[in-house]
Swiss-Prot record:
Forms part of the ribosomal stalk which helps the ribosome interact with GTP-bound translation factors. Is thus essential for accurate translation. The gene is rplL. It comes from Borrelia duttonii (strain Ly). The lineage of its organism: Bacteria, Pseudomonadati, Spirochaetota, Spirochaetia, Spirochaetales. This is Large ribosomal subunit protein bL12. The keyword Transmembrane helix does not apply. GO terms for biological process: translation.
Amino acid sequence: MALNKEDILTWLEEAKTSEVVELITAIEEKFGVTAAAVAVAAGPGPAAGGVEEQTEFDVMLVSFGDSKINVIKEVRAITGLGLGEAKALVESAPKAVKEGVSKSDAEEIKKKLEAVGAKVEIK
């Protein structure tokens, strides 16, 4: 009985890891090959002078403006910090409120802080 590719793939999906390892070892011995990853030549990179798009952003509190208390409340809501920690963060502006967030999250945080009078930058 000849096996086709689908039969082999179905068996691999259902096989235990130890069975797959045994199969790989048997193939290596039978054909004198190794299962090491093959180094592939890198394809063409981005266009010359292209800039990689940033995926993580930091939300920086530049200043708290005229409504320090409201900014502290919003910083607490955004970060989950305690009152003293949030107050220290706000008073030490310019300071990162959140680091390594997505662009949409950074924009949302910026809107919330600006709504209570803070000056905010996204880096």
